[in-house]
Amino acid sequence: MNNVLFVALGGSIGAVLRYLISILMLQVFGSGFPFGTLMVNILGSFLMGVVYALGQVSEVSPEIKAFIGVGMLGALTTFSTFSNESLLLMQEGYLVKAILNVVVNVGVCIFVVYLGQQLVFSRY
């Protein structure tokens, strides 16, 4: 039951962060491309790499893993919104933007997971 509370707390923080980042990206870049989703996915992927690597090189408690990995990052990143936005771009006739959205989200997020891991591994 303890871990459930950590997931809930982390999830509430991740959801608020997602909301604030999405608003910021909309204000900065406008609504022509789903930059908010892209940014939360990049940030969440990087942090997932860091958390994973920290778990490999040191003891990370189950509560911290639940709080960050499942709760905060689970609420911060979103595959369903990314998928819906990509489909909407296609349906609206923006095929190049849709393909770019998919390639950039997947490619960059895999790369920043790697960067997060390397950041931790280079220090241990």
From Swiss-Prot:
Transmembrane segments: 5-27, 42-62, 63-83, 95-115
Membrane topology: Multi-pass membrane protein
Activity modulation notes: Na(+) is not transported, but it plays an essential structural role and its presence is essential for fluoride channel function.
CC per GO annotation: plasma membrane
UniProt GO molecular function: fluoride channel activity; metal ion binding
Keyword Ion transport: yes
Domain of life: Bacteria
This protein's record includes keyword Transmembrane: yes
Catalytic reaction equation(s): fluoride(in) = fluoride(out)
Keyword field: Cell inner membrane, Cell membrane, Ion channel, Ion transport, Membrane, Metal-binding, Sodium, Transmembrane, Transmembrane helix, Transport
Coiled-coil residue windows: none
Principal place of residence: membrane
An annotated GO BP: cellular detoxification of fluoride
Family affiliation: Belongs to the fluoride channel Fluc/FEX (TC 1.A.43) family.
Protein name (Swiss-Prot/TrEMBL): Fluoride-specific ion channel FluC
Lineage summary: Bacteria, Pseudomonadati, Pseudomonadota, Gammaproteobacteria, Alteromonadales
Gene name as annotated: fluC
